[in-house]
């Protein structure tokens, strides 16, 4: 028993690695921000110019920055998604929403509610149309999951 208590193996664990308040160098943070996930704005713009709305929609929702704390990345992704949503024709919205799985509908709802937080000149009317179609596909559960989720977009 004395042999186990004198063991120093527990000292090899770096407990500061798990601390949220740990100091992070700004240069490391900037390098991590450059590698942050998010939709590629040039790819989405190219698809919008070609008129391929459905592929632009899926490209905008792909690699969403849910796990990052960098607000600049999140706002850039929100702008890209809002640009795609406002370019859709109202007759094509239902088809786009139905092409998503449950997690995709929840992610779309997160972006819709984020768009409601900061409305622009015509975005509220468009977002209400998207909300109607997403609610029809995802049900009330998608709203509850979005409002209770800890990870935001």
UniProtKB/Swiss-Prot annotation:
One of its GO terms (biological process) is regulation of actin filament polymerization. Its main location: cytoplasm. Pfam families: P16-Arc. The keyword Signal does not apply. It comes from the Eukaryota. InterPro entries: ARPC5, ARPC5_sf. May be a component of the Arp2/3 complex in which it may replace ARPC5. This is Actin-related protein 2/3 complex subunit 5-like protein. It comes from Homo sapiens. The gene is ARPC5L.
């Amino acid at each position: 028993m004395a042999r186990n208590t004198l063991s120093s193996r527990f000292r090899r664990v770096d407990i500061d690695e798990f601390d949220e308040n740990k100091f992070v160098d700004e240069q490391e943070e900037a390098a991590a921000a450059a590698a942050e996930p998010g939709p590629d704005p040039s790819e989405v713009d190219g698809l919008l110019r070609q008129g391929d709305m459905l592929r632009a929609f899926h490209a905008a929702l792909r690699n969403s920055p849910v796990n990052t704390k960098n607000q600049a990345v999140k706002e850039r992704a929100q702008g890209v998604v809002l640009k795609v949503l406002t370019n859709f024709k109202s007759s094509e919205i239902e088809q786009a929403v139905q092409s998503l799985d449950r997690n995709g509908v929840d992610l779309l709802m997160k972006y819709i509610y984020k768009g409601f937080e900061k409305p622009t000149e015509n975005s509220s009317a468009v977002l209400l149309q998207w909300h109607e179609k997403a609610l029809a596909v995802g049900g009330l559960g998608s709203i509850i999951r979005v409002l209770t989720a800890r990870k935001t977009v």
